[in-house]
């Protein structure tokens, strides 16, 4: 099911929660914003670079957590010290230091989810889209990830849009909420 019409602007540094039940159109809307699928009608525009972290990425054997995060940085764009610095920052932000040298295929689904999110933090982008970033995470890590997203948005001016099933999960960590009910847009929750 796809979301209904949406007429919305996002401010630099705004952290927006997109919520709704299964099939309400959260992932479809995220993919449309990311340019991965065309809109069914109308148009949209995104200024700057957009990074999307999908709900699920397959674990690849033979990479450490650190190497997995590093693969998100485009070769030739940054020097070795810049790459190291970006990966260090992402590892620190997502509190992955204790597993950074572990094989990515051997970490828990929750730790893998955090590593996937960390890949977004290695890139210079103006818009960050995260499709259910708190999937597979326990309560403490959900809070840590959502508060980190809010901090990143505020500190860097990056617009962050994340989706979730649970409106209570992220409402306190977002500046605004877009609630998709049954595949159609319903008014944002205050």
Language model regions located:
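The feature captures the beta-strand-to-loop junction immediately N-terminal to the Walker
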Residues: 19-21
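Conserved ABC ATPase signature
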Residues: 103-107
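Conserved ABC ATPase "signature" region
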Residues: 84-99, 124
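Catalytic Walker B motif of ABC-type/P-loop ATPase nucleotide-binding domains
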Residues: 128-132
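ABC-family nucleotide-binding domains
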Residues: 138
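H-loop/switch region of ABC-family ATPase nucleotide-binding domains
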Residues: 164-165
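Helix-to-loop junction immediately C-terminal to a conserved catalytic motif
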Residues: 34
């Amino acid at each position: 099911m796809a979301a209904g019409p949406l007429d919305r602007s996002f401010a630099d540094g705004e952290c927006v929660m997109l919520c709704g039940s299964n099939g309400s159109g959260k992932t479809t809307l995220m993919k449309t914003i990311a340019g991965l699928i065309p809109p069914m009608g109308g148009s949209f525009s995104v200024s700057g670079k957009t990074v999307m972290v999908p709900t699920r990425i397959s674990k690849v054997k033979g990479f450490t957590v650190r190497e997995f995060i590093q693969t998100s940085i485009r070769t030739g764009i940054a020097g070795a010290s810049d790459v190291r610095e970006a990966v260090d920052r992402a590892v620190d932000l997502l509190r992955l230091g204790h597993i950074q040298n572990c094989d990515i295929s051997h970490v828990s689904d929750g730790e893998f989810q955090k590593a996937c999110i960390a890949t977004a933090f290695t890139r210079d982008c103006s818009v960050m889209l995260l499709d259910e970033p708190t999937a597979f995470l326990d309560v403490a890590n959900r809070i840590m990830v959502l508060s980190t997203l809010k901090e990143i948005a505020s500190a860097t001016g990056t617009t962050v849009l994340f989706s979730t099933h649970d409106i209570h999960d992220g409402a306190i960590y977002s500046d605004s909420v877009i609630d998709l009910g049954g595949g159609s847009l319903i008014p944002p929750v205050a």
